[in-house]
């Protein structure tokens, strides 16, 4: 896939007691890349890049706005969880959540104004209506996919909920690194979501033993370019 450069290298060394292989990845942000150079992934539940580039929510960090997860094989699906996406300062906090299928997310309003949260995404459509400070409404996400969340009143508000049946999910650390140990051998799809790039996909083969290293290049984002 053009615009998504990944380097895969299988390392031979491994312990016989190892239950599976490790996938170690690194997200690299490239100032020279732009959204037009990224071909959208052919994926039924894909999330497309955001056209209007709304303002960033504070506090989550550059890589906190990137989600990675692995699909395929025996994912040993994790049960639903309860999570929260606050409405604060006319932003969603956090801006990006990754949750298992069937999870319930609360959307409390912490602002002294009304909000009206909604989504038109195929994976989960909803409209929570108008509600004031101190009130909260919940949404259950029964289907895997990417759900983009907005506010009818404040167009700058934007959030994303990644819903997946995979147990291998992560936000990269502040250096852009992520890893999962003990992945059974087989063929998988590495999924990467970033607001500017949308959803990107790369097929990865996990060997019986050793480690697979993956490097993913995405466009660099900043608060200035987001507006």
Predicted regions and their residues:
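Extracytoplasmic copper-binding redox domains, predominantly the cupredoxin/blue-copper superfamily
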Residues: 17-227
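Sec-dependent N-terminal signal peptides
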Residues: 4-13
């Amino acid at each position: 896939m053009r615009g998504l450069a990944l380097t895969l290298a299988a390392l031979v060394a491994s312990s016989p007691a190892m239950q599976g292989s490790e996938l170690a990845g690194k997200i690299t942000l490239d100032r020279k890349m732009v959204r037009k150079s990224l071909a959208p992934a052919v994926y039924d539940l894909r999330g497309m890049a955001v056209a209007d580039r709304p303002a960033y929510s504070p506090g989550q960090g550059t890589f906190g706005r990137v989600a990675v997860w692995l699909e395929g094989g025996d994912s040993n699906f994790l049960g639903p969880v309860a999570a929260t996406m606050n409405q604060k300062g006319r932003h969603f906090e956090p801006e990006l959540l990754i949750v298992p299928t069937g999870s319930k997310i609360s959307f409390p309003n912490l602002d002294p104004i009304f909000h009206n949260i909604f989504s038109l995404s195929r994976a989960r459509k909803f409209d929570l209506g108008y509600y004031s400070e101190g009130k909260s409404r919940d949404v259950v996400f029964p289907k895997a996919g990417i759900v983009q969340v907005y506010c009818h009143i404040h167009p700058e508000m934007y959030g994303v909920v990644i819903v997946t049946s995979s147990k291998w999910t992560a936000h990269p650390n502040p250096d852009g690194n992520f890893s999962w140990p003990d992945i059974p051998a087989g063929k998988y799809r590495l999924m990467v979501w970033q607001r500017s790039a949308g959803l990107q996909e790369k097929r990865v083969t996990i060997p019986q033993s050793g480690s697979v290293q993956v490097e993913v290049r995405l466009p660099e984002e900043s608060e200035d370019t987001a507006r």
